């Protein structure tokens, strides 16, 4: 599956600069991350509704749409599939592949992407009071 998502990611990158009049992907990039997030949320809700209704075939179709929209949002945010796979490996090493990390952090966070600002824990931030 990772190969399929990697190919999809590359196709999304290739399509982002196409004509928005003919490319759904280019149109999403033109409209921005807010529209991308809305489409992702819509697809997630459709997957949930179809799953609750027991419609297996619709869950499969809507899941493909969900993964497409997630991949578009990743590309917009500068997140590569391998970044996500690295985080999944880290979590698997901590808790096993089938577990979600608790909200309190366990272990080191994933290494930040080279172009991002470093994450500074809240407790390490100095608070300045203006007089």
From Swiss-Prot:
This is Phosphoribosyl-ATP pyrophosphatase 2. Signal peptide: none annotated. Belongs to the PRA-PH family. Pathway: Amino-acid biosynthesis; L-histidine biosynthesis; L-histidine from 5-phospho-alpha-D-ribose 1-diphosphate: step 2/9. The keyword Cytoplasm applies. Gene3D superfamilies: MazG-like (1.10.287.1080). It comes from Rhodopseudomonas palustris (strain ATCC BAA-98 / CGA009). Keywords: Amino-acid biosynthesis, ATP-binding, Cytoplasm, Histidine biosynthesis, Hydrolase, Nucleotide-binding. GO terms for cellular component: cytoplasm. It holds the Pfam family PRA-PH. GO terms for biological process: L-histidine biosynthetic process. It is found in: Cytoplasm. It comes from the Bacteria. Its EC number is 3.6.1.31. GO terms for molecular function: ATP binding; phosphoribosyl-ATP diphosphatase activity.
